[in-house]
């Protein structure tokens, strides 16, 4: 499920916050509280049919054989969000695209692994994301909003990526997205941090699953 992200810098010096606008689904007729609960649980089960796309979490290591990636949270000085927590968030937000999340203990960095809708046009997705970031942060001034797309080498292959930097005063907020494709499946690794080196360290903790 595609998400559009808004980067905002605010706070005492400046606090950076990622605003997530989730895509909506068709409205359902109102039912009793118990019926609503049953629908949510059923919806979750339907979306989780392809367990290979979900990947596998073993302690602090996440593996996804479909996209041939493995992420070691400890290697990036991060803590993995448990599968139970991700399941709870998925049900709560009625969004089942998030498959893995890890957060750092010190620098406030975060990495997500999300599976997008099959057949997602990556270049169109990136173009829309870039336009959203520029529009939502134009108040900072063009010189303080840097966002671009490029092709990078990731785990030995060329992949599409997006890099964004928002600056206010002495604080810069960084975000990097790396897009992976496997047949008709599309996934994105997203890293957010106020430390540029942490972005590289986090991506460096990804290896091939095989």
Can you annotate each of these PLM segments?
Residues 127-178:
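Signature of long, low-cysteine stretches enriched in small and polar/charged residues
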Residues 19-22:
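C-terminal motif of bacterial Sec signal peptides marking the signal peptidase cleavage site
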Residues 98-103, 172-182:
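Short, surface-exposed beta-strand/loop micro-motifs that present aromatic residues
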Residues 65-120:
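Secretory pathway targeting signatures of secreted, lumenal, and periplasmic proteins
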Residues 24-74, 80-81:
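N-terminal, intrinsically disordered, polar/charged segments of Gram-positive cell-envelope systems
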Residues 2-9:
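Bacterial N-terminal signal peptides that target proteins for export
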Residues 75-78, 183-210:
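Surface-exposed amphipathic alpha-helical segments
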Residues 56-61, 94-98, 153-164:
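Short, hydrophobic/aromatic-rich segments at coil-to-beta transitions
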